[in-house]
UniProtKB/Swiss-Prot annotation:
Keywords: Cell membrane, Membrane, Sugar transport, Transmembrane, Transmembrane helix, Transport. This is Putative ribose uptake protein RbsU. NCBIfam families: symport_RbsU (NF047342). GO terms for cellular component: plasma membrane. Disulfide bonds: none annotated. It is a multi-pass membrane protein. It is found in: Cell membrane. It comes from Staphylococcus epidermidis (strain ATCC 35984 / DSM 28319 / BCRC 17069 / CCUG 31568 / BM 3577 / RP62A). One of its GO terms (molecular function) is carbohydrate transmembrane transporter activity. Its main location: membrane. The chain crosses the membrane at residues 5-24, 34-51, 58-80, 95-114, 121-138, 153-170, 177-199, 212-234, 241-263, 273-292.
């Protein structure tokens, strides 16, 4: 593993780590955030396709790629709604934990990962540690009824949103399409869902004409940059799938800390310390789930 590979592997740290913070900083409603983010991703995907000469896939590969992108957009809409309740610094560790659980369980029961009793025990213990780590990141010294209510609502929302993220990762596996080939149709699927969602919310304002929607395209560039660098990092001649995945998960640390310090989502010193320990537990346990043979 060389220096260039590590740099590329840390691309998702910056892209996915800053994406929720930038989206929250620009503000607006979830409809503005999802519309701008998906348009930004589509622009990035079109430029990449033109640069590399990648055309749209055909047949079921196209269908499943579109479904994949639609799943992500659904999950991200739900996540943006959770941001409104508890802030990105608290929502991101939870949704990351749920995504890790979803991906791991799918791998075990559908793809045959973690063969053998010992590996399964280690894997499920690691998943338990991930849940404990996520719980630590939302711990508060003062028990406020409104916060507890919002947190419960956010957790339920993020559980529902995990369905979309699972579709995003699982749908392309139904075909042999590569990540680069799927990137553009995934972005198209994202935009389709965002446009439908915007049309459904026209009574609350025209997201297509609101300035903040177009400002949010910048957040989409960050998401797309992360997705692209992850695809490159996961290639065998770079970091490989397992190491690339672990490096990409460091984004939850940046997303959480930038939410705390740049979005003024304040924590006490004790809460911050426990949050950091929780993040470390999530990263360590996530690494274990990937490297189980």
């Amino acid at each position: 593993m060389d220096f260039i590979a590590i740099l590329i592997g840390l691309g998702p740290l910056l892209g996915w780590g800053l994406f929720p913070t930038i989206a929250s900083k620009f503000g607006g409603r979830p409809v503005n955030q999802i519309f701008g983010a998906t348009v930004g991703t589509l622009i990035f995907a079109i430029v990449l396709a033109l640069f590399k000469g990648i055309g749209l896939p055909g047949g079921m590969a196209l269908v499943f790629s579109l479904i994949s992108g639609a799943g992500w957009a659904f999950g991200q809409i739900i996540t943006f709604k959770a941001f409104e309740l508890v802030g990105s610094s608290r929502a991101m560790p939870i949704t990351t934990a749920f995504q890790l659980l979803g991906a791991s369980l799918w791998g075990v029961f559908a793809l045959g990962n973690w063969p053998g009793i010992t590996n399964k025990i280690i894997g499920f213990l690691a998943l338990l540690v991930i849940l404990i780590g996520a719980r630590m990141t939302v711990w508060t010294e003062t028990k406020q009824q409104e916060y507890s209510k919002n947190l419960r609502s956010a957790v339920i929302l993020l559980l529902v949103g995990e369905i979309g993220y699972w579709i995003y990762s699982a749908a392309p596996q139904a075909t042999d399409i590569g990540g680069f080939k799927a990137f553009l149709p995934q972005a198209i699927g994202m935009v389709i869902v965002a446009v439908i969602y915007a049309l459904m919310n026209m009574s609350k304002g025209n997201a297509f004409k609101e300035k903040v929607s177009w400002q949010q395209t910048i957040s989409g560039f960050f998401f797309a940059f992360a997705a692209l660098t992850y695809l490159i990092s996961a290639q065998p001649n770079m970091n490989g799938l397992a190491t690339g995945f672990v490096l990409s998960q460091t984004s939850v640390v940046l997303a959480t800390l930038t939410g705390i310090f740049f979005l003024n989502q304040k924590k006490t010193s004790k809460e911050l310390m426990i949050t950091i320990v929780g993040l470390v537990l999530i990263l360590v346990a996530a690494s274990i789930t990937v490297f189980i043979k």
